From Swiss-Prot:
Keyword annotations from UniProtKB, A to Z: Apoplast, Cell wall, Cell wall biogenesis/degradation, Disulfide bond, Glycoprotein, Glycosidase, Hydrolase, Secreted, Signal, Transferase
Protein name from the UniProt record: Probable xyloglucan endotransglucosylase/hydrolase protein 28
Region (Disordered): 313-332
Role: Catalyzes xyloglucan endohydrolysis (XEH) and/or endotransglycosylation (XET). Cleaves and religates xyloglucan polymers, an essential constituent of the primary cell wall, and thereby participates in cell wall construction of growing tissues.
Location within or outside the cell: Secreted, Cell wall; Secreted, Extracellular space, Apoplast
Entry comment on modification after translation: Contains at least one intrachain disulfide bond essential for its enzymatic activity.
Organism name: Arabidopsis thaliana
Amino acid sequence: MGFITRFLVFMSLFTSLVSGFALQKLPLIQFDEGYTQLFGDQNLIVHRDGKSVRLTLDERTGSGFVSNDIYLHGFFSSSIKLPADYSAGVVIAFYLSNGDLYEKNHDEIDFEFLGNIRGREWRIQTNIYGNGSTHLGREERYNLWFDPTEDFHQYSILWSLSHIIFYVDNVPIREVKRTASMGGDFPAKPMSLYSTIWDGSKWATDGGKYGVNYKYAPYVSQFTDLILHGCAVDPTEKFPSCKDEAVQNLRLASEITESQRNKMEIFRQKHMTYSYCYDHMRYKVVLSECVVNPAEAKRLRVYDPVTFGGIPHGHRRGKHRSRSRLARTESI
């Protein structure tokens, strides 16, 4: 086997490793190595092994923590266990933001966990903002295929120059590709990683119909398996840059494998309950980064015919995969 052939084989294997597995093999860190308490006093408790932390919401206050460093791109992950029983109005967030540095034009990448009344399941919401574009909501909401209150499950965000990918238990559930027309709407400035629990009674559950009932407090969320793998930068630099070779490999990691993409499509068809890309009441012309999937559109129209009753003009139609091909894919 010649040198060029051996090199091409190595690069093929390396790309597969990075995109498929390496992100899940990144080292875990102790809480004090990467984070600082943000608020909450005694409502934040670090386990004596230093690897896990509890955030609590009670009548007095919520709680939260923030990364010690500020990052320009990276992979950020934690295994989280949510409060059980009645949790309406409770919001638990795992997100990137620079709102403290850029009050009028901040960026944000969100995982939000929205509590519910007894007998109804938690919901997950993902969202992104760039350059203060809060007037353009890019929310998606989902149910899960497991009970997130019974055990820990891993939630991860990959943020690169061109992609944002949200994962649940290593399954990609949402991919945002940067488009030229997005401009500053794509998060591009250095951000910190935050985790918080707080009272979102005004909006979190059925638009505020059900609020937090402190009779069931304290509400406790637990975090472990903490991963902070990114390019730490100095935000005071005029043009902060990321030159870390390991972080540059995020470009490769953002290439979703065929197996991962199949799992993502199945998840979205089974568990997605809202996407701004299909909300024709909100957007008459779909935003540029949206790729409309006919199967997703059909399911959402059945789920909520008023909101998703038609497909807006101007969308890009995704490649349609045959039903037989999806049937061969592992169920989620």
